[in-house]
Swiss-Prot record:
Component of the ubiquinol-cytochrome c oxidoreductase, a multisubunit transmembrane complex that is part of the mitochondrial electron transport chain which drives oxidative phosphorylation. It is a peripheral membrane protein. It holds the Pfam family UCR_14kD. It comes from the Eukaryota. This is Cytochrome b-c1 complex subunit 7. InterPro entries: QCR7, QCR7_sf. GO terms for biological process: mitochondrial electron transport, ubiquinol to cytochrome c. It is found in: Mitochondrion inner membrane.
Length: 118
């Protein structure tokens, strides 16, 4: 148990998080964390549908640019890579919409369970 606690403390260390962010490599393509989502999950699709047009266009541009870079086996210049702080700030653009969709889904399930008790 002590070993697990030390491991969790190490993983939650901001220095380790920055190091791991650099290892993941999606920043080399100019992508943010929320640019990766499950295209088969209805909750994610609904959250993407609710994005404002400017955020949706920015997301689409980043994904297309990253696909083109991957096809040509290139990376963006280092000065265009999003930093860890930028990813934590701007890169979580889908999370509020996804949280809203999940709350609505939970509320619907509660109502169905409440109404089916009769």
């Amino acid at each position: 148990m002590v070993h697990l606690t030390k491991t969790l403390r190490f993983i939650n260390n901001p220095g380790f998080r920055k190091f791991y962010y650099g290892l993941q490599g999606y920043n080399k393509y100019g992508l943010y964390y929320d640019d990766f989502y499950d295209y088969t999950d209805p909750a994610h699709l609904e959250a993407v549908r609710r994005l404002p047009p400017d955020l949706y266009d920015q997301h689409t541009y980043r994904v297309i640019r990253a696909s083109q870079l991957e096809i040509t086996k290139q990376f963006l210049p280092k000065e265009q890579w999003p930093s860890y702080e930028e990813d934590m700030d701007k890169g979580r653009f889908l999370t509020p919409y996804l949280d809203e969709v999940m709350k609505e889904k939970k509320e619907k399930e509660e109502w169905v369970n409440f109404l089916s008790k009769d």
